[in-house]
Amino acid sequence: EHTSHLIYIKKGIQGFTVEDITRAARIGKRKFYTCFPSKEACLFEVVEYSYQAQLEAFKKIMEEKGSLKSKMTRFLKEVYLSEKSINNYFSPEDFHAILQKLPPTYTEREERMTSEVLETAMTYIDLTRAQWEALVMLLDCLTYTATRSYVETAKKAKEETLDILIHSIADYVEKQTQC
């Protein structure tokens, strides 16, 4: 929780240390290293926790009444890109860089996590394998845009771009499931 909050405050994973985490959590380094073998392992846990929370929110939204398009739009705006969502501060490249520093067991955990997310999503959204791959790429575009810092004058353009991407993704999902 403290690390997640730190990522939010710092607007990304760059530039903070184990000491920053322990200070935010008000624990000693020994306690930190009792729980996590490294900063990267801690960050992995934050991502895993965040994805689980997003998955639960996704299921809740998908169970509600409404069109698939409106539910996808709501999920993307209110959960996937909420103000404190890790997707705003933690890019796919960041996650890949962290995985490179961790033992292979973390890659296996990431694969299981991805499979669980995909299997759950497939119960609500009927897409072919190629369409799922396209959706994942579209979500990567959304995350890429969300994680980038822009000059103050471009913030409005960023917000507009995110909105266009959200509606495009929701349109795509609804259109493909009707085919």
Regions found by a protein language model. Name each.
Residues T3-K11, A53-E64, L138-S149:
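Solvent-exposed, amphipathic alpha-helical segments
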Residues Q52, S85, L99-R129, E133-M137, ...:
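Amphipathic alpha-helical packing segments from all-alpha helical-bundle domains
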